């Protein structure tokens, strides 16, 4: 027995380790076009201007709870782009493009993790599909917003994203706050699943400062990343045990941000805890939010809707071919006609308000 033999200490619970294309290789395989790059940059710059209060419009992050069929999702994107152009003078539309689903327990973790929805976990193909879909959305001319869940994902798809959000289950995580401080987009922090604001406000504060953390370069090499801090983190209110979109909750959040000497920017997620997971309640939430803006609440900068071609949701199937490509497999969504009606209402009310505000400034 050689003196060098040790008991096996590593990878005791690892079945296999498969190499993955580097971010540089993936970007070379699916490169940005000038048109796509312009969409992403315009999206980021517009969101920054809205968050700075220089642009009086409201932004709307609208799209499926999760994407499971790319053809249906592209059809959705084209419909959304047509509508976005019609309402662009008062509402700036970003498509919600979620490929990763944080699960409270277990379940399908999204297109990147298991693109074929059959427990084959072809993650490299999932990343390629995600990157290619984001490229298509950018080519259509829609900025995209997504959830920052896997900490390596920004290296693979971050150049195609205009808005990121850190979800309720990860807003307290040090790793995500560090990445938020270095990410190239405005970034939302959701309140905790229990409704508490502390994690989101501390997340905003943390992301605004510099950090030093470990990551992987475009060539897949470990490196230390040192960040300057992100000037555009904001709180996303998604409800908890009870909703938190009402005027008192929003005023409380604004006060907490002011007390912490942080920018008073709030986005309302009309779904999740604010809708009690009932998709058709999203309209009530949005109307309440618009009423608050009309009453002079200036901290509300945007809202989120979970929307799909068809409403409701469907259970997962052992045979994914049996799934309806146009209906959510995760949270309930509102259908397209409802989405269009709500966005047009938001546009009409914001247009009127912006007109009144500009007239009162002239006088």
Model-inferred region functions:
Residues 23-31, 227-239, 327:
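Gly-rich Lys/Arg/Thr-decorated short loops/hinges at beta-loop-alpha junctions or inter-strand turns
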Residues 59-72, 331:
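Conserved phosphate/anionic-ligand binding catalytic regions in large, soluble enzymes, centered on
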């Amino acid at each position: 027995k050689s003196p060098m033999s040790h008991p096996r200490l590593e990878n005791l619970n690892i079945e296999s380790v498969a190499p993955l294309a580097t971010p540089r290789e993936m970007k070379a395989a699916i490169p940005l076009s000038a048109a796509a790059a312009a969409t992403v940059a315009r999206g980021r710059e517009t969101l920054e201007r809205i968050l700075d209060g220089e642009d009086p419009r409201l932004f709307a992050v609208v799209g499926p709870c999760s994407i499971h069929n790319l053809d249906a999702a592209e059809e959705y994107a084209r419909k959304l782009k047509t509508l976005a152009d019609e309402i662009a003078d008062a509402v700036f539309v970003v498509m919600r493009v979620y490929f990763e689903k944080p699960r409270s327990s277990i379940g399908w973790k999204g297109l990147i993790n298991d693109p074929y929805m059959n427990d084959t976990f072809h993650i490299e193909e999932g990343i390629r599909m995600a990157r290619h879909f984001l490229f298509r959305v950018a080519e259509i001319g829609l900025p995209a917003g997504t959830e920052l869940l896997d900490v390596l994902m920004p290296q693979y798809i971050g150049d195609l994203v205009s808005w990121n959000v850190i979800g309720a289950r990860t807003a307290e995580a040090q790793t995500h706050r560090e990445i938020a401080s270095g990410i190239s987009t405005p970034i939302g922090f959701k309140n905790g699943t229990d409704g508490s604001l502390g994690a989101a406000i501390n997340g905003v504060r943390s992301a605004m400062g510099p950090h030093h953390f470990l990551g992987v370069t475009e060539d897949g090499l470990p490196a230390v990343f040192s960040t300057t801090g992100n000037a555009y983190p904001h709180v996303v209110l998604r409800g908890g045990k009870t909703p938190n979109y009402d005027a008192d909750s929003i005023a409380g959040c604004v006060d907490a941000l002011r007390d912490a000497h942080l920018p008073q920017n709030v986005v309302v997620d009309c779904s999740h805890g604010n809708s009690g997971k009932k998709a058709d309640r999203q309209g009530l939430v949005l109307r309440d939010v618009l009423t608050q803006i009309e009453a002079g609440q200036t901290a509300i900068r945007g809202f989120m809707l979970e929307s799909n071609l068809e409403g409701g949701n469907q259970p997962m199937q052992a045979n994914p071919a049996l799934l309806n490509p146009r209906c959510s497999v995760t949270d309930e969504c509102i259908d397209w006609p409802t989405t269009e009606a709500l966005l047009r209402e938001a546009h009409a009310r914001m247009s009127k308000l912006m007109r009144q505000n500009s007239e009162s400034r002239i006088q």
